[in-house]
Amino acid sequence: MKRHTHAFFIMIAVVLLGSCDGVSDSGGASVHEPLVLPDVHDPAQLVRVGDALRLYASPVEWWAYSLDDRDWYFLGDDLYDGNNPDWDLGDAAYWAPSIVQVAEDRYRLYHSAVYDEANHGSRIGFARGVVADGEIAWAPVDDYVVESDGYDQPFAIDPAVFPDDEGRHWLVYGSHATGIWIVEIDPDSGFLAERPWDKRWRPDDDRFTHLADYGGNRHDENNIEAAYIYNHPENEFYYLFVNWDRCCSGTDSTYNIRIGRSDSPTGPYLDRDGRALSYGGGSLFLDRSGEILGDSRFVGPGHAGIYRHVDGDDYFSHHFYDAASGGTPSLALWNLAWVDGWPRIDRGRPVEFE
C-alpha cells in the first residue's frame, strides 16, 4: 500500500486575539497554529488506535497521525479493497464517514453511498472494523441502515454516530431538503433500533426526530448539513454542530459552523440565545472567512469533530479551504477549551499530545 508523509510545522505569531464565540482569549500570549493536513474533505472525528490518531474522510480515505513521530501517514483509499457491498448499487460515491468504537478493538465506519445526487438518492451503511497488529481491517456488511430517494425526506448523507450516557447509540444525518434528523441505532447490530427492515423516513414515523433547519438568509433553500453531536463526558450537555450555506467552491465556499446544546440526544437543541436549532437557531462557532480565528486562511470551515485525548484534553477538527494554497481542502486540528459550558478554539496552546 502506497504511503505518503506530510510534514507539518507549528507557526507562532505574537498577536493579541480577542474573545469571541468560537475562540478563547489568549490573554496576550502567543497565538498558535493548528495541525494542518492538506487534501482532506469531510473528515470524521479522530480516534486513537495504538500510538496513532486515525482520520477518515471523503471519499473514504484514511491517514494516521503518529504520536511518536508527530507526522501524518497516508494509509489507504479503498475501504472495501474492491469488494464493495451490493447495497451501494454498483457505482455509488462514498462520502463523509463517521467512526464509532463499539467494543475493545472493534469499530464501525458509517458512510453514505450516493447513487443519484440530483434526486437525493442515497443510502447510509457501515463497515465493520477489527484492530489487528495496530491496523483496522474493514469488512463490508451486506445490508444498509437508512435511505432516501427524494427531496421530501432527509437526504441520507453526512452520518454521525455517537453513544449517549445510557449506552444507546444514535445516528444524526441529513442535508438540505428536510434538514437534520436523528434516529436510534442498535449498538449490537449497528442497524436501526426499531424495525430495521423499514429503512425509509416518513413524516409520521416517530423513530425519527427533527433537530435542525437552516436559519440564514444567503439562500432560499434549506442549506444545512454536516451535523455532528458531541456527548460531553463531564457535563449534562450534548452539543450539536451543523454547517450552514455551501461548500465545495474553494475560497468561494460559504460554509460556516453553528452550534446548539441540549440535555437530551434528541433535543431540543438551543443556541446561546435560547433559539431552537429546529427553527433555524444556531450560534456562530466558526465563520466562513476566518474572522473568528483571526486568520483569513481558514475559509469555509465544515464537518466538525471532537477528539478527547487520554489526558482529558479536547481537540476540535474540521476541514477548510486553504486560502494560503489556492483553496485546497484541508484538515485543521485545534485545542478546544470549554468556557461557561460552551466550546471555544484555544489558540493560546500549541497542539501537542502528552
Q: Predicted segment positions?
A:
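Bacterial N-terminal signal peptides that target proteins for export
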Residues: 1-8
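Carbohydrate-active catalytic/glycan-binding domains of CAZyme proteins
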Residues: 20-354
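Bacterial N-terminal signal peptides
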Residues: 8-18
